[in-house]
Each structure stands twice: as structure tokens, then as C-alpha cells.
């Protein structure tokens, strides 16, 4: 994948950029690598590497919709796209997306307004005509509506500062939403929130991982070290013997201040992130 290759090249140069990190983590997810390679690169930005908190930044407004569209959280994707159109004008990409989002949100007449604008353009008339065929179908190929069957709470005010509660909500409403699960796990790990990570690890049972990703095992073991046996058993999970041996090796190097070897052997682990990289310090959040 070109996006993954290009963002890797940038990150490997030692530079830090929120937009690059945002697209890099999206690329990791879409190639099935997010739980396995999240810590292969120094996540110096913490949770800001996953998404853009809403802060009325014109450049961010242009790209903020991608994660929400991929999650199937179309209302939020639409909000970002509308704000982007206000900032950047009625450009074809924004009009296309707003038409698509309004179709799946069952607002055909609103979608038609955007389609009619597109039909006036030389290069996007064909796209507009294709979307026009979808107007009353209420669906667009390749676009999922994660909360479509949620009739009890159809209206929801999104948390525009912190995506964590939104990811939790999506997981609870649709236990098959793998992206929501992996992003929730990443969000909780990057924010040092190990207790909530373990509380939500139950969702992993809805997906077919060959085995629990190493970073998840590493976080689970940190949790195990901080609670009594009875509390840990309530999690319903076990830590592999290999993970425990690796931690003993990690702790031995750490205790003996063999920092170069520690980084060489464990620089891509959650333990190393928590000790040396997390922008929130090395303390575990327990609530």
C-alpha cells in the first residue's frame, strides 16, 4: 500500500506530524496491522495520532471525515465535511461526500442539492449521475452506516474533543465493528488507560484473531501486576507464558539501566511506550 509506505518513510526520518500519524494509523488498520504495529513507531503524540479533536483548524477540517466514514459514523463524517466545505468552498470532493452521506442518512432532497451542483461541473457530471441513481435506495456502494439499526437512540451529540466515548458507543451498539474496537483499544492504550482497556477487551471475542496481539498481552500483564488474583480472574483472560518471560527480560534490562539494549529489544512494545514515550507520563490511569 502506497500510503503506508509513504507515511512509514516520513516517520522513520524521525519527524513527528499529526496528519502523517493520522493517515499512517488508518493505513495500518486497513492492512490489518494496527493491533500488531501500533508501537513499531514512536507514538509521541499519544491519542492525537489517531484522530483530530475538533478545534476549528482549517487544514484538519479537510481530512477529519476519513476516520468517521471508515467507522461508519456517518453523522460525524458529514459534520466534518460540511465544515470543510464552509472553509474551502463548494469543491467537488466535498460535494460528492455530502451527497453520499445524505443519501445513506435518508435525506434524498438534501443530497439532490449537492448532486445538482456537481452536475454543473465538467469532470464530475458522471459521478453525480451515478449518485442520482442511488438517491432513493438509501445506500451507496462502499459506505456503511454503523448505527443504522439503532432505533432507540437515533440522535446523539458526538464528543468532538475526545473520540474515545464515541468508539465505546460504536462498540456497544455494533459488536461486529472491528475498526471501532481496534481504535478503542488503541485510544485506551495510548492514553495509559489500562483499566478501561481491560474492561473493554471483552469485545475481542467477536473477532477472529489468531491470538491476542502482543501489545494487548503486554497491557494485560501490566494490569495483572497491579491487581490481586481474584480481580484479575474476573477479566476472563490469561497472559501467555511467553509474555511473562519477555517482561522479566524487559524488567531486568530496565533495572540494570541497559537502555540501548532495552530499546533495541523492546522499543516496539507497550511497556516501552508507557515508560519512555507516552506524552501523559509513565503513570497508569486507573479510572
Label every model-predicted segment.
Residues 1-164, 168-193:
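Soluble catalytic regions of membrane-associated enzymes that act on cell-envelope
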Amino acid at each position: 500500500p502506497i500510503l503506508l509506505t509513504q507515511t512509514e518513510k516520513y516517520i522513520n526520518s524521525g519527524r513527528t506530524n499529526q496528519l502523517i500519524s493520522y493517515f499512517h494509523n488508518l493505513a495500518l488498520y486497513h492492512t490489518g496491522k494496527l493491533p500488531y504495529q501500533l508501537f513499531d513507531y514512536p507514538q509521541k503524540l499519544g491519542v492525537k495520532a489517531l484522530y483530530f479533536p475538533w478545534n476549528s483548524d482549517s487544514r484538519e477540517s479537510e481530512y477529519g471525515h476519513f476516520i468517521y466514514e471508515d467507522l461508519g459514523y456517518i453523522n460525524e463524517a458529514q459534520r466534518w465535511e460540511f465544515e470543510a466545505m464552509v472553509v474551502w468552498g463548494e469543491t467537488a470532493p466535498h460535494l460528492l461526500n455530502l451527497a453520499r452521506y445524505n443519501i445513506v442518512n435518508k435525506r434524498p432532497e438534501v443530497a439532490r442539492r449537492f448532486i445538482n451542483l456537481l452536475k454543473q461541473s465538467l469532470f464530475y457530471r458522471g459521478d453525480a449521475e451515478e449518485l442520482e441513481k442511488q438517491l432513493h435506495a438509501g445506500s451507496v456502494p462502499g459506505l456503511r452506516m454503523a448505527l443504522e439499526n439503532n432505533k432507540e437512540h437515533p440522535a446523539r451529540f458526538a464528543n468532538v474533543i475526545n473520540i474515545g466515548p464515541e468508539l465505546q458507543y460504536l462498540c456497544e451498539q455494533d459488536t461486529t465493528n472491528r475498526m471501532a474496537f481496534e481504535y478503542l483499544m488503541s485510544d485506551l492504550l495510548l492514553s495509559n488507560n489500562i483499566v478501561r482497556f481491560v474492561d473493554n477487551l471483552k469485545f475481542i471475542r467477536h473477532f477472529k484473531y489468531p491470538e491476542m496481539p502482543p501489545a494487548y498481552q503486554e497491557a494485560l500483564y501490566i494490569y495483572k501486576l497491579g491487581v490481586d488474583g481474584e480481580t484479575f480472574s474476573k477479566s476472563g483472560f490469561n497472559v501467555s507464558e511467553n509474555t511473562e518471560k519477555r517482561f522479566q527480560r524487559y524488567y531486568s534490562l530496565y533495572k540494570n539501566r541497559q537502555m540501548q539494549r532495552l530499546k533495541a529489544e523492546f522499543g516496539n512494545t507497550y511497556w516501552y511506550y508507557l515508560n519512555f514515550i507516552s506524552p501523559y507520563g509513565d503513570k497508569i490511569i486507573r479510572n
